[in-house]
């Protein structure tokens, strides 16, 4: 078969599926991405994992950006250091948002809390979503109104949920202008051609997918000449019919 660990992933988790039971197709509604799990996020379980003997953590990095690696490893490194010092790392809502913005199809503990398939697999989308802002309250000629769950500034990337059943397309673009409205709501406007507002509807879910300020900060951290460098000696042994063996010293 095609191994994702060898760069040959068939992307089965990104595809919609149908269920046929006793010859009849089951109405799944929006829940069509049956193999698309939420991302395993165990940052708040680090002390427990170390306590039970976990000695190494693997963080998904395949097809991810350098900014993602800098962001996620930074948060996990802090959690590990705090755990070794006998303290539990505190993750603020902003910390979690930063991790979600780097890449997230929703966070879950996977099977670390036992079996809960409905939490592990939502099934209603298969792409990166980021931070859920809320639902569209109203649609105007040049933008939408909603009460966002977190701060939105000009330049932020957004995506609006689509609906395959009704033909409502998924759309995304960058915010051009943010206008304050009443009762904590804001009006978001977009650049010309970025989002077709006529195709947006009240009740549509809105997600924040990118924060330019966060991305710029992460890129600066990658260019920091004072960043700690560690010498690493790798020795690899490959033989036909045997597993690849790599030692790091």
How would you name each of these model-derived features?
Residues 1-249:
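Surface-exposed amphipathic alpha-helical tracts and adjacent flexible/coil segments at the periphery
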């Amino acid at each position: 078969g095609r191994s994702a660990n060898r760069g040959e992933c068939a992307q089965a988790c990104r595809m919609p599926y149908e269920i046929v039971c006793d010859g009849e197709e089951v109405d799944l509604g929006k829940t069509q991405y049956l193999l698309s799990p939420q991302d395993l996020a165990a940052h708040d379980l680090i002390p427990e994992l170390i306590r039970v003997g976990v000695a190494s953590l693997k963080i998904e990095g395949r097809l991810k950006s350098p900014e993602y690696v800098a962001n996620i490893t930074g948060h996990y490194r802090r959690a590990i250091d705090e755990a070794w010092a006998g303290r539990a790392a505190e993750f603020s809502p902003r910390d979690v948002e930063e991790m979600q913005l780097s890449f997230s199809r929703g966070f879950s503990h996977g099977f670390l809390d036992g079996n809960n398939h409905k939490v592990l697999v939502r099934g209603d989308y298969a792409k990166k979503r980021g931070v859920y802002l809320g639902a569209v309250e109203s649609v105007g000629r040049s933008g939408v109104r909603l009460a966002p769950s977190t701060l939105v500034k000009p330049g932020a990337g957004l995506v609006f949920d689509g609906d395959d059943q009704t033909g409502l397309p998924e759309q995304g673009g960058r915010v051009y202008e943010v206008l304050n409205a009443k009762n904590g709501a804001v009006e978001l406007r977009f650049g010309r051609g970025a989002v077709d507002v006529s195709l947006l509807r009240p009740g549509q879910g809105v997600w924040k997918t990118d924060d330019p300020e966060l991305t710029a900060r992460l890129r600066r951290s990658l260019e920091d000449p004072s960043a700690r460098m560690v010498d690493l000696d790798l020795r690899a042994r490959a033989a036909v019919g045997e597993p690849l063996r790599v030692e790091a010293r």
